[in-house]
Amino acid sequence: EAGEECDCGSPANPCCDAATCKLRPGAQCADGLCCDQCRFIKKGTVCRVARGDWNDDTCTGQSADCPRNGLYG
C-alpha cells in the first residue's frame, strides 16, 4: 500500500517495523527471493533455477526481487 516499505502483517519479521510498515534501521529489505537477513543478496546469486534451455535468473544486488532475465541459453 502507499507509504509502506514492507508488509507489516507479521510482528515477528525482524526487518519490518509492524507498527509503521517501514524497514527497521539498517535493513535493505524485508522479504523477496533476493533478500536474506534484511540485506540484498549478492549480485549473480541464482534466485530462480532455469527450466529447459533458459538461463537461471539471478539477483541484481540492488533489489529484493528476482528479475526474470529471460535469456535463452
From Swiss-Prot:
Sequence ranges assigned to domain Disintegrin in this UniProt record: 1-73
SUPFAM superfamilies: Blood coagulation inhibitor (disintegrin) (SSF57552)
KW Aminoacyl-tRNA synthetase (keyword) present: no
Pfam families associated with the record: Disintegrin
InterPro entries: Disintegrin_CS, Disintegrin_dom, Disintegrin_dom_sf
Example of a GO cellular component annotation carried by this entry: extracellular region
Annotated compartments: Secreted
Motif Cell attachment site positions after renumbering to this chain: 51-53
Other comments on record: The disintegrin belongs to the medium disintegrin subfamily.
Subunit-level organization: Monomer (disintegrin).
Function per UniProt: Inhibits fibrinogen interaction with platelets. Acts by binding to alpha-IIb/beta-3 (ITGA2B/ITGB3) on the platelet surface and inhibits aggregation induced by ADP, thrombin, platelet-activating factor and collagen.
Protein name: Disintegrin lutosin
Native organism: Crotalus lutosus (Great basin rattlesnake)
Lineage, highest ranks first: Eukaryota, Metazoa, Chordata, Craniata, Vertebrata
